UniProtKB/Swiss-Prot annotation:
Membrane topology: Peripheral membrane protein
Biological source species: Saccharomyces cerevisiae (strain ATCC 204508 / S288c)
Keyword Endoplasmic reticulum: yes
Protein name: Peptidyl-prolyl cis-trans isomerase FPR2
Gene3D superfamilies assigned: 3.10.50.40
Coiled-coil residues: none
Signal peptide as annotated in the record: 1-17
One GO MF term: FK506 binding
Regulation of activity: Inhibited by both FK506 and rapamycin. Binds FK506 with 15-fold lower affinity than FKB1.
């Protein structure tokens, strides 16, 4: 309960204060240490389900759930936005996180025309579905 209150307060204090300056990670579903056999590390191939929205308005701009297929990428090599490389690192399969990503770690001043406005801070609810270790 305290964690949910913390996320709520953090989320709304960020909106009231304006733009984010740092990546903020909230744990939605934690995996017990004894059940976490593999953590996602840079160089690993990962599969992630997600829903992305604009922090300011809450408008959802993309979701792998609606397509029925998670996104697959190599972690930590710049194939996704920096906020994802940083926010997914250390996750266990089945873990869920809420990533509040400042525009500087997302699409920056250019945004994504017609989808994400310039300098937009983003929120991603992510779930790590699979990890293939690089080692």
């Amino acid at each position: 309960m305290m964690f949910n209150i913390y996320l709520f307060v953090t989320f709304f204090s960020t909106i009231l204060a304006g733009s984010l300056s740092d990546l903020e990670i909230g744990i939605i579903k934690r995996i017990p240490v004894e059940d976490c056999l593999i953590k996602a590390m840079p160089g690993d191939k990962v599969k992630v389900h997600y829903t992305g929205s604009l922090l300011e308005s809450g408008t959802v701009f993309d979701s792998s759930y609606s397509r029925g297929s998670p996104i697959a990428f190599e972690l930590g090599v710049g194939r996704v936005i920096k906020g994802w490389d940083q926010g997914v690192a250390g996750m266990c399969v089945g873990e869920k996180r809420k990533l509040q990503i400042p525009s500087s770690l997302a699409y920056g001043e250019r945004g994504v025309p017609g989808v994400i406005p310039p300098s937009a801070d983003l929120v991603f609810d992510v779930e790590l579905v699979d990890v293939k270790s690089a080692a």
